[in-house]
Amino acid sequence: DTDVKIVLQPNPGLIDEFNASTGRNCQLPPEGSYTVEGTEVIIDAGKSQSSQIKVSANSDKLQEGVSYCMRVSITSVEGGDLKVLESSRTAYVMLTKVITIKAAYLARKGCFDIPSFGGEDSPVKALGQMTLEMKVLPVSFPTSASSANGISSLCGCEENFLFRFGDGAGNPTNKLQFVKGSIGAASHPDKKDHYESWVEKEFETGHWLHFAAVYDGQYLRLYLDGEQIHFVETRNGGTINLSMAYDGHTWEDTFAIGRSAGYARFFDGYISECRVWNVARTTAELEDGICYVDPTSEGLISYWRFDGETQEDGTVLDMTGHGHNAKPYGDITYVDNQKCPF
């Protein structure tokens, strides 16, 4: 047995093939934004792993929300009788800028309403395709699993299309539930088919998680941190109506963040990056957009960052410019130094 020396070389060529095969929209990192320390690695005799080279990036030269990709290729191999498997000659190094921002802390004392989602002219009244996504960090979970006080609402519409922790019926208060999932031809959520489900995991406090529901007109898929965890084929397709929610007495409520069944069932935790789309986002798009997306992205109806920047009237700006600002209710504070990717 002999040592094997492998020479590597950054190859900043086109990445169209990589994007096409993965469904991503990566860009080449800007010139001078990264360094590669060394070009050679050694596989010691009798070993199966090589030494390492270090790739460093200058975050000041990277943009928020952009996924960068750099090709690194094997140019030569010396020693032993190993040959390069051509399909593995090139590796792709992913670079993403770490974002440090504030997040809204609801503390079971506050929430946000989206008044412009209600009414006959609502942009979310009949969604033939849809993506709903959000980042949350639970601070605590209720102790009363067998009452409505054990529910922690995240975002959506009560008795219609809602993400929450717990169900108030004895299930653990730290399990994520997707409630009702109303989809169908009828306009009223109660008259649609229902596709609710649970995430079979009990969550801990103090950790960020990203969840999403994606509907493409036929299939409803649920994602956790960019990975698909559930899917169901709808019986008859149809639309989703996020303009209506049950307030405990009537259907005059609408989409809200951090509450449900009226002003109740609040969430004790941080929230960030809530978005509603009229397109079905792909797995790769969800992964790439966990921390940030371009507010002008196609199909993006509304986008709230909850990063501490508020308007004169106290609302949180809809970053798309469509005017669906989030109206605060109750006591909401903002916490510093929240990092993403998490």
Identify what each model region corresponds to.
Residues D225-E252, D288-C291:
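Short, solvent-exposed beta-strand-to-loop segments that form ligand-recognition rims
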Residues R89-A107, Y292-F342:
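Extracytoplasmic low-complexity segments
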Residues T96-L106, L137-V139, G168-T239, I332-F342:
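Extracellular glycan-interaction surfaces
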Residues M130-S140, R265-G289, S302-T310:
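Extracellular, beta-strand-rich glycan-interacting domains
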Residues S116-L132, V199-H207, A264-Y270, D294-S297:
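Extracellular/lumenal carbohydrate-interaction signature centered on repeated Trp-anchored short motifs
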Residues Y246-S272, E287-C291:
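Extracellular glycan-interaction patches encoded by glycine-rich segments
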